[in-house]
Curated annotation (Swiss-Prot):
In the N-terminal section; belongs to the NnrE/AIBP family. Its EC number is 4.2.1.136, 5.1.99.6. Residues 8-205 form the YjeF N-terminal domain. InterPro entries: Carbohydrate_kinase_pred_CS (IPR017953), CARKD (IPR000631), Nnr (IPR030677), Ribokinase-like (IPR029056), YjeF_N_dom (IPR004443), YjeF_N_dom_sf (IPR036652). This is Bifunctional NAD(P)H-hydrate repair enzyme Nnr. Gene3D superfamilies: 3.40.1190.20, YjeF N-terminal domain (3.40.50.10260). It comes from the Bacteria. It comes from Helicobacter pylori (strain J99 / ATCC 700824).
Amino acid sequence: MLSVYEKGNALDKRVLEEWLLSEDILMENAAMALERAVLQNASLGAKVIILCGSGDNGGDGYTLARRLVGRFKTLVFEMKLAKSPMCQLQKERAKKVGVVIKAWEEKNEDLECDVLVDCVVGSAFKGGLEPFLDFESLSQKARFKIACDIPSGIDSKGRVDKRAFKADTTISMGAIKSCLLSDKAKDYIGELKVGHLGVFNQIYEIPTDTFLLEKSDLKLPLRDRKNAHKGDYGHAHVLLGKHSGAGLLSALSALSFGSGVVSIQALECEITSNNKPLELVFCENFPKKLSAFALGMGLENIPKDFKKWLELAPCVLDAGVFYHKEVLQALEKEVILTPHPKEFLSLLKSVGINISMLELLDNKLEIARDFSQKYPKVVLLLKGANTLIAHQGRVFINNLGSVALAKAGSGDVLAGLIVSLLSQNYTPLDAAINASLAHALAGLEFKNHYALTPLDLIEKIKRL
């Protein structure tokens, strides 16, 4: 997993003060990272347009232009007059080696290009973009688009101006910034990469409590013993609500992810031999012996024995439970909560936090972190375009999910994966992380995003 920071200022300061690297060296390395992205996506001689702002982000752009001129048809547009000392210096250096620099007002030529590089605002963006920064029309003329550090129009909280630069790849300088991982930013950053600034990243980084999950972090269930039986791999119990299909999907998902036994219990529906999958065990009552249980999928009302069940085994709580105040009984237990934003708002209201959906979406990371600090036994998995998993103030971000998962039943499959890992003795945090990764990666395996069904998803999970 990768370390994530709200801002890179403290990291850069450490490089300058402790290791005596200069701003010049940092900027040269930033330009080298951008240069690699250009070389990977364009042939020599291709046309490259670089948009430069007034600060150090613009300085990165002028440095890039100096490195490209002679190999590419390089054109720089000065979107704002160079103001920072490094930006002014790099602009002069670029001019000395023959880089063509024009004011934006001089754009009287064909703006079509092979590569368009955004070095306008970066991390300095606040408020709204100036009217003349028409990235949308410019982007339509470029075959490939690169953003330096942060696409212009995304602020430090991940809020996005509707006219923001939409990149095919974003090179985050030094380390990944949390603003690049907001739900709203997901459509603007493209592929996310880190540009190293002259120091190995593990030396460059400082301690953080925010992390980006990677494919390599996934630890699938392991059956490495030959002398074993079903009891060695746990008993997961799934309680079915009024909409029984949701719980059945969870149960099938749990069975496909390694649980030795998966049982179901009908709370608000009827299950018969005709509509129960043969591989699931039917229980009329809550089992006396079990490893973990899942409740909430398709549920309308909280069962009267809910509090008693919480004492018997670790659990996953999903969907319908968050609309009932009885869920507060679970907040002092080791449980995994898996709400989507609307359900989380209902839960927050129950604990006395009244905010709007807009406030939640604009401050999702901070709110999830604060909630996990207030309820340290709980693991919160907050769904969204990027999933947040929060525990005791640490937040793990899964940005691997795709639009293929935007289907009814997808979340039920996820609940089943989590309860399966819980039943196999994963810690609640590890269960949430690994289930989330498996869920996302299985979604990426499906070719047509529009066609994925929950049962397809389970089949893909079996093949990870």
